[in-house]
Amino acid sequence: MKNTLYERLQALPITDLAPVFDNGARGRTMSASSCNWLLSKVCEAGVKTIIDLRTADHTDKFCKKVHDAGLAYRHIAIDSKNTDVREIIASLPDFFAWLDEGDFYMACAMGLHRTDIAISIYYVFHPSVPYDSVPELRGHRKQGSLRCDDIARRLNSIMNALTPEDLIRLGLPDGYRDEFNRRKKHLFAINSIF
């Protein structure tokens, strides 16, 4: 399916811009003061929500700039190992809803690494994402191969920490580990071909 939001954003000078499924985009955080005009253009292009994945470098200043540009601001700390896994799990229902709404721009400091992890979490743990809707991972490619250790570490940490109550909250069945392994394997297999 065509991602018209991504197509409209391609006209703008956004570093590391990439599509997210058929309803969003991702790239670098536009937090520098020189990017204020760009946030307004992103809004004009149809983005309604900025999803900030930064952890320690997250600031309220960027939140204000986003609101001043007429956009909604959402934050979830995502990384490969430092953010507490329970914090991430608690945020997943909201995070999945933000992506389901569409018209979002997901951002991290460098544009691709944390967003790779985030869209992998969405693909592997959100029950409404079809098995064949594998996201393209762009930030973890190095010298002709996919470097999946950071992504696998975070996916495994979430799976290992899920309680029966978490599974219910996320709409996942008991015994989800088999489907988790199937999706994780498929994610890495598809992305190893580029």
Regions found by a protein language model. Name each.
Residues 1-106, 110, 117-194:
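Cys-dependent protein tyrosine phosphatase-like superfamily
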